[in-house]
UniProtKB/Swiss-Prot annotation:
Residues 39-82 form the CHCH domain. A motif (Cx9C motif 2) lies at residues 64-74. GO terms for molecular function: copper ion binding. It is a peripheral membrane protein. The lineage of its organism: Eukaryota, Fungi, Dikarya, Ascomycota, Saccharomycotina. This is COX assembly mitochondrial protein. One of its GO terms (biological process) is mitochondrial cytochrome c oxidase assembly. The gene is CMC1. Interacts with CMC2. The twin Cx9C motifs are involved in the recognition by the mitochondrial MIA40-ERV1 disulfide relay system and the subsequent transfer of disulfide bonds by dithiol/disulfide exchange reactions to the newly imported protein. It comes from Saccharomyces cerevisiae (strain ATCC 204508 / S288c) (Baker's yeast). It comes from the Eukaryota. Keywords: Chaperone, Copper, Disulfide bond, Membrane, Metal-binding, Mitochondrion, Mitochondrion inner membrane, Repeat. It is found in: Mitochondrion inner membrane; Mitochondrion intermembrane space. GO terms for cellular component: mitochondrial inner membrane; mitochondrial intermembrane space; mitochondrion. Required for mitochondrial cytochrome c oxidase (COX) assembly and respiration. Binds copper. May be involved in copper trafficking and distribution to mitochondrial COX and SOD1.
Amino acid sequence: MEQNKDPQMISKHSSRLPIWVLSPREEQQARKNLKTETYKKCANFVQAMADCAKANGMKVFPTCDKQRDEMKSCLLFYQTDEKYLDGERDKIVLEKINKLEKLCQKQSSTK
């Protein structure tokens, strides 16, 4: 990928950080995205726990231990392995790169 050293393009880029460095807000968004994806991937375990809890009411803890442990294991698998969080970070960096490339194209077409 060719880097554009155009000063106008650089001045319109709102961040002083390199494009691959995430701001705290972007890091928070990556973690939120990971949580959403994790719950999608573990939906069957989460649903099994919810169904068990609904069926057993106050006796949920001794009765639903198996479902809770399976749900917890699935959720922690995705949330503690850095490669999944890195994947979400990569998605945000790619979005930033695409926005910057569109800005560069827009600036080059106006000249």
